[in-house]
Amino acid sequence: MAITKVHARQIFDSRGNPTVEVEVTTDKGLFRAAVPSGASTGVHEALELRDGIKADYVGKGVLKAVENVNKTIAPALVAANLDVKNQKAVDDFLLKLDGTPNKSKLGANAILGVSLAVARAGAADKGVPLYQHLGELAGNKGPWILPVPSMNVLNGGSHAGNKLAMQEFMILPTGAKSFTEALKMGSEVYHALKSVIKAKYGQDACNVGDEGGFAPNIQDNKEGLELLNEAIAKAGYTGKVKIGMDVASSEFYKDGKYDLDFKNPNSDPSKWISGEELGQFYKEITSEYPIVSIEDPYDQDDFESWSKFRADMQDKIQIVGDDLTVTNPKRIAMAIEKKACNGLLLKVNQIGTVSESIQAALDAFNDGWGVMVSHRSGETEDTFIADLVVGLKSGQIKTGAPCRSERLAKYNQLLRIEEELGANATYAGENFRRPF
């Protein structure tokens, strides 16, 4: 089935910033997709095209990207008469049309919107659910796997105004028997955490950040881990709910050192620590707390520290590359060669097409890595990644706290998928790193 029309518009994301929405029309109907956007971005990511006009939307307008879809991509794609079921042919066509290594001509946000909408059209043309179509594109077939949600419930770093250097503290309900039960556990721990925070720091500490997590005035990282332990115990899930962290350490890497006081403009350089010292801290906390996954423990180009830490930990925990790998096959190949990590954070907008995202996951799986499909901090109500994580059978998704509708949209879609699959649904649980 060929495409008869492509149309883009500017809409708003969960932070009130403009983003791109694309509609692709075929004889089967109209298929829509919206593009997310990150706050802490890796320098190696594909280019998100913004207008940069300070007087309009604080420089964050995307009307140029929208125009690139409507005036360049749309007529070319309709004329090409490609079959929407052949995702790779469509994506290759888009890449050729752009012609740059980082999608800077048309914008990764323009290209991705089209790519996502085409995938939806392809599923409809085949008459199958989106997760099944995406799974088949990845060479998978059922039974399908429901992911462990990695819920960001405590915020620091660039996502919060407190002193916390590390960006996200997450809960993973690995001890649940189903995704439905996992969401119940996550929700109950989240509410227990809220009451613990309210008692310790007061009502105003219960405001939520971009991804629905709390950002109380925590002074150091261990204090955050203690809060999580307390909330997990209070909800009655000790042993069943584990902890994950996104350190986002590229945000506080300065002159070859790590500044855990980076939010203080008068931070003392003599207190900045080496990668080796930071590694000691990670070893300490992984022995004291039920931590199963650490994302971006080091700067995106500090390969030496990554490789040493992975060798030291001997795969006891998942070490996830995000800024390190940016869902880019070349960066993933480099990380595989240097044995830098054993997990990939998969963000479709870091690379910019569905086909390249699937290839990134396959490359990671081939080296025995785990793959965690992820949202961005600036999200929309689009639920594409919920279907993607099921189709890839990757067993883990990171899409925020059980709070804020743009986060719950993904979790609710996973509830629907689990219900639809019935007895054919398998929850990844404790096997979330290698579920199949």
Curated annotation (Swiss-Prot):
Pfam families: Enolase_C (PF00113), Enolase_N (PF03952). PANTHER family: ENOLASE. Its EC number is 4.2.1.11. NCBIfam families: eno. It is an enzyme of class 4 (lyase). One of its GO terms (cellular component) is phosphopyruvate hydratase complex. Mg(2+) is required for catalysis and for stabilizing the dimer. The keyword Chaperone does not apply. GO terms for molecular function: magnesium ion binding; phosphopyruvate hydratase activity. It is found in: Cytoplasm. One of its GO terms (biological process) is glycolytic process. Homodimer. Substrate binds at residues 159, 168, 295, 322, 374-377, 398. This is Enolase. Pathway: Carbohydrate degradation; glycolysis; pyruvate from D-glyceraldehyde 3-phosphate: step 4/5. It catalyses: (2R)-2-phosphoglycerate = phosphoenolpyruvate + H2O. Belongs to the enolase family. The active site is at residues 211, 347. Keywords: Cytoplasm, Glycolysis, Lyase, Magnesium, Metal-binding. Gene3D superfamilies: Enolase-like C-terminal domain, Enolase-like, N-terminal domain. The lineage of its organism: Eukaryota, Fungi, Fungi incertae sedis, Chytridiomycota, Chytridiomycota incertae sedis. Its cofactor is Mg(2+). Mg(2+) binds at residues 246, 295, 322.
